[in-house]
Amino acid sequence: MGQHILAIDQGTTSSRSIIFSPKRSIDAIAQQEFSQKYPKDGWVEHDPEEIWESVVSTLKEVFNKCSVAPSDIAAIGITNQRETTLVWDKHSGKPVYNAIVWQDRRTAQYCRDFSEDEAFVSYITEATGLLLDPYFSATKIAWILDNVEGAREKAENGDLLFGTVDSYLIWRLTGGESHKTDATNASRTMLFDIHNQCWDEKLLSKFNIPASMLPEVMDCAADFGVIKEEIIGRAIPIQGVAGDQQAALVGQACFEKGMAKSTYGTGCFMILNTGDAPLQSKNRLLTTVGYRLNGKTTYALEGSIFMAGATVQWLRDGLKLIDDAAESEALAQRAREDNGVFLVPAFTGLGAPYWDPDARGAILGLTRDTGISEIVAAGLQSVCYQTKDLQKAMESDGARPTTIRVDGGMSRNDWVMGFLSDILGAEVERPEITETTALGAAFLAGLQAGVFNSIDDLTHCWKSDSVFTPRLTKQERDQAYDGWKSAVARIRCS
């Protein structure tokens, strides 16, 4: 058996396949973007067939980029955009509707209707660790069943299946032989009891979702099925699965209570390991499954920010202030210090800890001296300020991060990471391999395949590239953060 591991990283805007060597270095990466669909204001969809084709394309391409052969692969790991919802016919395999993406807000009215039952809203949080919000899968499934002709009847007859993206890919890769998910993805559906690690019958009944639609929930390192030989020329077991942010937690080797990782992709997601007991947040953070290995659940506290890299995309595509993301660092370095400009990127509302879907973005503090550099810098700083919001909320919940590790595309921007350390007042560690989401999936698959013996092996694989230390005084840090809080207060709607 080979010792290489193949990771499938199915994200919000693209799919990637990455081959990791036995030494945990990257042998090859293949990536393919796919289209985003916005049929109505606040709606975001993906074509399931485009997702599938992009995954298969990268699986084939990645082997053309290196000397590794499919026979060298010990196992496959899958990580994916979470909450995104698919429903398909279990006989034909055809989706009954496009994938409804995690960013989609069409079920806001569903949530408003359910919110009138305060006892039920409290039950959701107690059972799932989540807040009632369109972000999660439950109301997306309900919308599909209520709005796609014939879907409700088919579901009640046991003819439809639900899955987050991981589950859909497992189904397709195994030729329909395996309908499974892992505990991290299940924990993001708003249908999963994170304490008893099972689907919650009360929630299924309230949301009117047949239990027959749901996948079997597995550990993150487990046997999920074997991909069909015709896909890449060899039948290879799928042995590791985790939602993208939990996969990054594993890839960052945050296995000790108090360790946190913050991933900067389209959005920003900060997850703190809270150990073997779930910590219920009083500050609107999410209690979730960090990972589950050998039947033992490690819990986490999570804060979700909707706009991180997406803010840079808006500076580029919307305002046309930059030609590419790399240019933003040079411009920010030229910005006047203490310029008083704040950009609040509430383009689709505010995430944690505010959860204000009606808030809208603004640039505040503009003067005649304000130029492109100051606006770009404010956009980059907004990501750091929002991370500070999460840090403060975690500390208020009694869970102060002891270690903060960063990854994702924006983590390669030294200016941003320097300011992040400044505003957090803490050291920020960046690893040698910033592809930690895919690495986490590879780690999990490697554990099940026997490439790794234990999580101690994974801890020793993690290597630091850079450590950023705070330069601001406490007074300077507090003054800057007070300015941010004032800016947010001015655009809040709830």
From Swiss-Prot:
CDD domains: FGGY_EcGK_like (cd07786). Pathway: Polyol metabolism; glycerol degradation via glycerol kinase pathway; sn-glycerol 3-phosphate from glycerol: step 1/1. Its EC number is 2.7.1.30. It is an enzyme of class 2 (transferase). InterPro entries: ATPase_NBD (IPR043129), Carb_kinase_FGGY (IPR000577), Carb_kinase_FGGY_CS (IPR018483), FGGY_C (IPR018485), FGGY_N (IPR018484), Glycerol_kin (IPR005999). It catalyses: glycerol + ATP = sn-glycerol 3-phosphate + ADP + H(+). ADP binds at T12, R16, T266, G309, G409, N413. Key enzyme in the regulation of glycerol uptake and metabolism. Catalyzes the phosphorylation of glycerol to yield sn-glycerol 3-phosphate. This is Glycerol kinase. It comes from Alteromonas mediterranea (strain DSM 17117 / CIP 110805 / LMG 28347 / Deep ecotype). The gene is glpK.
